[in-house]
Amino acid sequence: QVRAHQPINTDGSINLEAWLDHAVSVDLALDREALKEACEFARASEQQANAAKNLWSEGTSSFRTGLEIAEILADLKLDQDSLVAAVLYRGVREGQIELPAVSQRFGPVVAKLIDGVLRMAAISASLSPRQSLVLGTQGQVENLRKMLVAMVDDVRVALIKLAERTCAIRAVKTADDEKRNRVAREVFDIYAPLAHRLGIGHIKWELEDLSFRYLEPDQYKQIAKLLHERRLDRERFIADVMNQLKVELQAT
């Protein structure tokens, strides 16, 4: 699991300079100043909009989420335009930033990436709430996945959306039940399989793990308990073998 690296100042704000240092250390090909410009623009836009700091749950915001999305993409070694688009995406989605302004300031490629992610979000939003893990028939869910893949002419769009949904499923832990389950169902049915198709195993596993935890908490706890017991059994077995080896080595 890729965890957010967001250094905090004493007043609770993001230490942007430290964050940029970390981002560039992950990928030396990144343009620090261009990324800084995008971050400052996103932060200023959020402040001007007087946006609530609770995007998915207490303490989240479009700016902080943009940084977390960018971190995930930096770990995947995506390019500069992708990270700039990631930083700005939630601001555009929340109406804090206009897409033409993005195109004018950061270029048409960044604007096109954000527009593609917005279109993906619009299609996946057609996923209706349901009581079970499967919406309608499995065929309907599969058709929706295929539609998302078909509409994406740049794989970077899908990767940005995957990173954004990863941030969402992490953040809804403290959200209300309706919001948490809605995000989890979308992630489980649409985005975890998409991560699998794109060969991003660590994101697939995190999406599946967190969404299943929220959708089927009793089964999740049961499985976690079994895995814990097996881990303890393995540890005891290894300890026994090590002790036996020590005895045999001392006897020689």
PLM features: residue spans?
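Active-site helical microenvironments for divalent-metal-assisted chemistry
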Residues: Q1-T252
